A protein has these predicted regions:
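Hydrophobic transmembrane alpha-helices and immediately adjacent juxtamembrane helices
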Residues: 1-120, 124-134, 138-247
């Protein structure tokens, strides 16, 4: 059905990027200059972008369910009005939608991890360099939770399909410039600081550190960033739903 095609597209897109850039461009580039894993070994370009695309896959799975899906239910399906007429509250609605989006992000992360593990086994270049890479799945869940919470909060303020297009307008540059395909050191320092504030950069650095075995204090900072994102997203969402449907 068309629904499954839409669901699959969010997973397939990062896989295509990995094939085109990782295996294609990676064969020309070789190792990434100045980047080593936790054991001090050089990192191939494919191993460099694979965790970034894993984080992106988790984001894609969460963001589309918590934005377009929620937008339709809010403005056309009139689903939330019926739910809130029962004993359920706005927090229940928010957690239900966000949990569903989180599950999709988790499924994308599981599938993409299987893909990069298979590619690493076939090419002889392991894309997960450390046992800590197993925690990348848990990191993907946190990432999906954060983006789903914030995505639903933003969507609750949008009123038209034209306004919804602003979400993609923000996501694409964030995907391209958040250290997905090359280190931030290529940018001026002030640009680097601006990118540090972006949630996808935080997600990519968290997953990349785990897959490369680089465990440091910065990892905790990335985790806290998403905890704040989750709490803030839930707070804004519940307040907005209350003002829309419980006046």
């Amino acid at each position: 059905s068309s629904t499954w095609i839409i669901v699959a597209s969010g997973f397939v897109e990062p896989v295509f990027y990995l094939m085109a850039f990782g295996l294609g461009l990676g064969a020309v580039i070789g190792n990434v200059t100045g980047i080593v894993d936790g054991a001090g070994n050089p990192v191939s370009y494919t191993a460099y972008i694979a965790p970034a695309l894993l984080a992106t896959s988790a984001m894609n799975g969460a963001i589309y369910d918590s934005t377009w899906n929620v937008f339709f239910k809010m403005h056309f399906g009139k689903l939330y009005q019926g739910i809130l007429a029962t004993s359920m509250g706005t927090l229940d609605v928010a957690l239900g939608e966000i949990t569903w989006a989180l599950m999709r992000g988790f499924a994308y992360a599981i599938g993409f991890t299987a893909v990069i593990s298979g590619i690493g086994a076939v090419t002889g270049d392991p894309l997960i360099r450390s046992w800590t890479g197993i925690f990348a799945i848990l990191a993907a869940v946190l990432i999906a939770f954060g983006f789903a919470s914030f995505g639903m909060a933003i969507t609750s303020y949008l009123k038209s399909f034209q306004q919804m297009n602003w979400i993609n307008f923000f996501l694409m540059p964030m995907f391209l410039f958040s250290g997905t395909f090359y280190p931030l050191s290529v940018y001026p320092e002030w640009v680097q600081w601006a990118i540090h504030a972006m949630p996808l950069w935080q997600a990519i650095e968290m997953v990349r550190g785990l897959t490369l075995g680089i465990i440091d204090a910065a990892l905790l900072g990335h985790v806290l960033y998403f905890v704040v994102m989750i709490v803030g997203g839930l707070w804004f969402t519940t307040r907005r739903l209350r003002s829309l449907f419980l006046r």
